[in-house]
Amino acid sequence: TNKQWIFIILLVIIAIIVFIKWREYYYKKLLHTDTLTQIPNKQYFMKTAEKILDNNSDKSYLLTSLDARNFKLINERFGHIVGDQTLMNIAKNIKSKFHKNGLYARSQGDSFLILVEDTSQNRELLKSLVDLDISIHNTTNYKVPLKIGVCPIPRYNPALSLSLYIDRANIAKKYTSARNTNYICYFTDDMNKKLNMKNMIESEMVRALSKGEFVVYYQPKYELANDTIIGAEALVRWNHKEKGIISPGVFIPVFERNGFIVDLDFYVYEQVLKMQKHRLDMG
């Protein structure tokens, strides 16, 4: 009958609508979910965290970056299957502690992000993440210590990007100690000053080298027996155009990490050779 056909058509239409809605939900979830750990991914975290901070600018938050210490060794010793299981266990542990009152995500590799309100309870929960016990091949328990860097956000400033707060949490994470259980570190103003100095050094090092701001000094070497100078040690200082003399203890570690130390070494060699040639020419 016509009524039956109308009913069937309505059912088909409803089924199509339900399917379309389900597909939209599925693809949206797929877009925002990390395929391995099944927790939100960084894209979802960034979008949602900004909304939370914008809508709660009167509250204080903690933005946390964490990863597994020596995760590469876990992969090398036990294989990638165990490595993946470790990441899933970390995600499960984070989810169990913060699913009610926090935002969390897998950022990349073995790195995870957490955003929670700054309360004593949440600080204790973050501290409790430090050590994770996992089972290897269902027999061996293996302790996986986590490195945790936390950036406090007393009042959210929209002028500062969320990426900046994440960078600060990552900097704090680098300060975590390998001794005892000191695997959690909070970002401080002192770290900020060191970060600003590092950024200044890296942004100006090439210009400074080309402009001859690195000055070579010669420290005499004495032979005590004869009380005579037998040589000299070449020392370099950075005579910055605005900041004045910068100690090598400040810029050398930065150069050693980013590889610019090679350029500086060749510059010093060149200055030493020029000095020696000048002395030979002068007789």
PLM features per residue range, with description:
Residues 197-254:
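Active-site core of bacterial EAL-family cyclic-dinucleotide phosphodiesterase domains
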Residues 104, 147-157, 161-179, 185-200, ...:
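Cyclic nucleotide signaling catalytic output domains
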Residues 29-33, 38-62, 69-99, 105-113, ...:
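Conserved long alpha-helical elements within nucleotide-processing catalytic cores of c-di-GMP signaling
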Residues 115-124, 140-141, 145-165, 172, ...:
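Catalytic strand-loop-helix junctions within cyclic-nucleotide turnover domains
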Residues 2-35, 42-53, 193:
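Signal-transducing coiled-coil linker helices
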Residues 31, 50-62, 66, 77, ...:
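Nucleotide second-messenger and two-component phosphorelay signaling modules
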Residues 85, 89-155, 278:
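GGDEF/GGEEF active-site signature
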Residues 267-283:
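Helix C-cap/alpha-to-beta connector motif
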